[in-house]
Amino acid sequence: MAAVEEAQFWQAIGILIKNYHALNKKIFEVVITQVTKQQNGRVCESSAEELAMSLKEDPSQRTCTGFTIGFKLLSKKLAENILGTGIVDFENCLYECQFASDSIEGFSVGLLGGEFKLKSKSNTNWLEFVLRPKLLSWSQSKQDEAKVKSLGLVNVEKYNDLYKELKQRHSQRLLEHWKTAQESTDPLKFIYEDLAIAAYLIVLWSQTQSEPTAFADLGCGNGLLVHVLNAEGYKGYGYDIRKRKLWSLYPPDTQRSLIEKAVEPNSFRLDFPGVDWLIGNHSDELSPWLPVLAGRLNINYFLLPCCPFELSGAKFRRRNTKISAYQDFFQYVTQVSHECGYEILQDRLKIPSTKRLALLGIKRKASKAIEDLEYFVQEELRKYKTGDAKIKLREKEESVRNCTQVDKTIIDGLVFKIFKLILDSNEDKWSGRLPMREIAQALTKEELSGIKSECGGIKTLLRNKHEVFEFCGGDLIGIRTPKPTATLPKSHLTIKKRSCFFKLHHPLGCPLDDAECSFIH
């Protein structure tokens, strides 16, 4: 392993100071509360910005010998946050960290002979298996100065405190709603994500003095965000093309605020007066339209883009293939916002989702005419060969894309074909394995396109036929060996309804007796 240089050491320490929460899952964020520096034998006031610059400077250019940092660790669950002190010692290439809590042990990091030297009273496993790998990674990482900082627009401590309060007030009841509605989606992900977004919006509105008279959440889905904001005293409404089971479980006020209605871009009108904020929370096809609709109404908006779409409702066409598809789409929506005349703010939320970048339009330029906005929209639709009449967003009936809508004769034909391919790949007729690519190459274009339009591809088809096929790792597909019912968990046992595939189609028949098999012989 290459020796760690002094510049790399201080780079790692600079990241550590601001990112201790990356080493401790119980900590939400680090907030620096005070910085002083040691200069010419005196202690002087300083700042987090000066500290960051000094850590990057060449040693010969530094004007101080070290810094003392006061910080606060924001706890994810505990009511009280934890205070700490960090000491940067440039002369001895040393960083020490102590905490005003018995629950976290202090430590020190030094540089000696090109290696990190780590010390603590007793927590040696944490030093070696958590801290050291992170320091090595941070010392070699390239810093992206343009990267959007998480929660950069809000007071992080206020946000964390409110988020904890919202979880205490709402999470248990919402979990019960989820069970009652028999929702198939992950309740913890959706509940905690929308509680985090609600906390963010409430703190943002308070800080920017832009609290809404009323808001409208377009494409509100399960209505969870609308419900929480309503419960916290913020008047607002949710629109979605399709009513969800959860809607009927919310309090009457929230139920009246959830509107089953298609948001058609060229004809949409709000049903209630006073709305001065639009919200797009993973609003899919509506995402590029949100700044346009807000611009037409001359109001603020908050957008958390997710799946990429054109204004026409078609799948998003890449503009810049040098970056990720998500970043490309985010840049496109940012451009749309500029064309709508907004002064744009960006932030990165801390939510259980990979799509965390938020776009906010809080102030619209008075000089931007609505005619310019409409011209831009028409040009975009023309460029991508979609006129007004062809704008097509989501259907009211959600399409099912899991192969259950494909003609049964097509499914059966594909299953038999793939089954025979694997069967013939080995003499014993049971242990054959074929790569997914080889199976796909053996199918015709018509066969592949027939299932791709409905379920996204052959993999879903094979998963749905789990009683016949199995995934063997390394992209290999095999024939599943039938297991006796006696070896199956009770929860997996069902009343026999279907004929045994192997009894009917395997040249050696089913290896199980009728009593042992899960299917009818």
Curated annotation (Swiss-Prot):
EC number: 2.1.1.211
Superkingdom of origin: Eukaryota
Keywords: Cytoplasm, Methyltransferase, S-adenosyl-L-methionine, Transferase, tRNA processing
Keyword Methyltransferase: yes
Localization annotation: Cytoplasm
GO CC list: cytoplasm
Pfam family for this entry, one: AdoMet_MTase
MF GO annotations: tRNA (uridine) methyltransferase activity; tRNA(Ser) (uridine(44)-2'-O-)-methyltransferase activity
GO BP field: tRNA methylation
Catalytic activity annotation: uridine(44) in tRNA(Ser) + S-adenosyl-L-methionine = 2'-O-methyluridine(44) in tRNA(Ser) + S-adenosyl-L-homocysteine + H(+)
Record's function text: Probable adenosyl-L-methionine (AdoMet)-dependent tRNA (uracil-O(2)-)-methyltransferase.
Family: Belongs to the TRM44 family.
Protein known as: Probable tRNA (uracil-O(2)-)-methyltransferase
Protein's organism: Drosophila melanogaster
Lineage: Eukaryota, Metazoa, Ecdysozoa, Arthropoda, Hexapoda
